[in-house]
Regions:
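Short, acidic loop-to-helix structural element flanking the phosphoryl-transfer center
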Residues: 1-10, 16-20
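Residue-level "hotspot" positions that anchor or transmit function at local structural transition points
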Residues: 10-11, 42
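Asp-based, Mg2+/Mn2+-dependent phosphohydrolase catalytic module
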Residues: 16, 21-118
Length: 118
């Protein structure tokens, strides 16, 4: 995805200290142009603030962004921010109808392709 020229931002409810530690441990921090946590916002997910701020920091309006989520609260936050949404719920929740509000639902991150981002 990054090789296609997309900017990647991380909008999370997790504390930044934890996020930074995980990204460093996995050596994947360099993939993210922006990292932003709801801990710096007045409200966490499902409020859209963390997504709106991440889009702003990336230099985009939310309508130009695509959110990839795994949780229902995150999906609600991204939809409320007016982003296109791709959801990849845990297998146990894959058939839960509440995820049908997503624009695209996948079973695995491995299924995500550049075609989903058009």
């Amino acid at each position: 995805i990054k090789t296609k020229g997309f900017k990647i931002g991380l909008a999370t409810s997790s504390p930044m200290a934890l996020v930074d530690a995980v990204l460093a441990r996995l050596n994947i921090g360099h993939y993210f142009a922006v990292r932003h946590s709801a801990e710096f916002e007045e409200y966490g997910k499902p409020h859209p603030a963390v997504y709106i701020q991440t889009a702003t920091q990336l230099g985009f309006v939310p309508q130009e962004c695509i959110a990839v989520e795994d949780s229902f609260n995150g999906l609600l936050a991204a939809k409320s921010a007016t982003m296109k949404t791709i959801v990849i719920p845990e297998a146990i929740n894959a058939n839960n109808s509440r995820f049908s509000i997503a624009d695209i639902q996948l079973s695995s991150l491995a299924e995500l392709s550049a075609d989903h981002l058009n």
